[in-house]
Amino acid sequence: MSKKIVLALGGNALGDDLAGQMKAVKITSQAIVDLIAQGHEVIVTHGNGPQVGMINQAFEAAAKTEAHSPMLPMSVCVALSQGYIGYDLQNALREELLSRGINKPVATLVTQVEVDANDPAFLNPTKPIGSFFTEQEAEQLTKQGYTLKEDAGRGYRRVVASPKPVDIIEKETVKALVDAGQVVITVGGGGIPVIREGNHLRGASAVIDKDWASARLAEMIDADMLIILTAVEKVAINFGKENEQWLDRLSLSDAERFIEEGHFAKGSMLPKVEAAASFARSRAGREALITVLSKAKEGIEGKTGTVICQ
């Protein structure tokens, strides 16, 4: 049975530099086209953690050495990352589709996502961006005015505000493109964060979590399924411990209980489970799947992954 699927890719799965990204999108595109070949409508979203951090750092470094080089706000850095990633991803998807004899247009949409100016996240930056640093490197960057936090045992990363998405500004455009039979790449990096001021949309200094933005998009375009891709095949409780348990299905009540018990790492699995549960809760019959990219096709068939449902 054909489904309308929002597929959320992680920014870390797209490589750490230009060469790595070009290789990664080819592998990613093969898995995405596997789903399209099955008859599913696939809307692709993606993270931008490494990429937006590099863009921001590059312009900051240039501004320190070149008087005429501007400091770019985070909203503009997110917009740049949407074009940078979308360009490679849409071309890789187009090539993979044509190689299989599938004539389906691919479009990358510059997408704005509304956030609340009073969201408490602006007072407590938590969203990791950019490269990993050692503790010593983190101390030096802190002295330079950056905020860094330890990221799930992998090192230290810069963090910025991560408000919850309220509205997808270009949602009608996404719907129109999907209805016209196109593969749409949208809400890249969680979307460009904007605050509504009357008829004006003002860029916000933040990076929206792409899993939360993907869940909101999936709700607003009436998707059947949200697939959140990660580095592991299934969600686990007691991860890394002797009593580690991998989960095939996760009810909303169990998801809430495991979140309260602290089973999922902040900045890693926690936002994925929270976003998946939010989508599943939004309407009866909606399901979210968390799995690894190479198993997405099997996950839809119920053979692997963790399904979050009512």
UniProtKB/Swiss-Prot annotation:
GO molecular function, one term: carbamate kinase activity
Keyword Transferase part of the UniProt annotation: yes
Pfam families the UniProt entry points to: AA_kinase (PF00696)
Gene Ontology CC entries for this record: cytosol
Any single biological process term in GO: arginine deiminase pathway
UniProt keyword terms in alphabetical order: Kinase, Transferase
Domain of life: Bacteria
PANTHER family cross-referenced by the UniProt entry: CARBAMATE KINASE (PTHR30409), CARBAMATE KINASE-RELATED (PTHR30409:SF1)
NCBIfam families: arcC (TIGR00746), PRK12352.1 (NF009007)
Family according to the record: Belongs to the carbamate kinase family.
Protein's recorded name: Carbamate kinase-like protein YqeA
Gene: yqeA
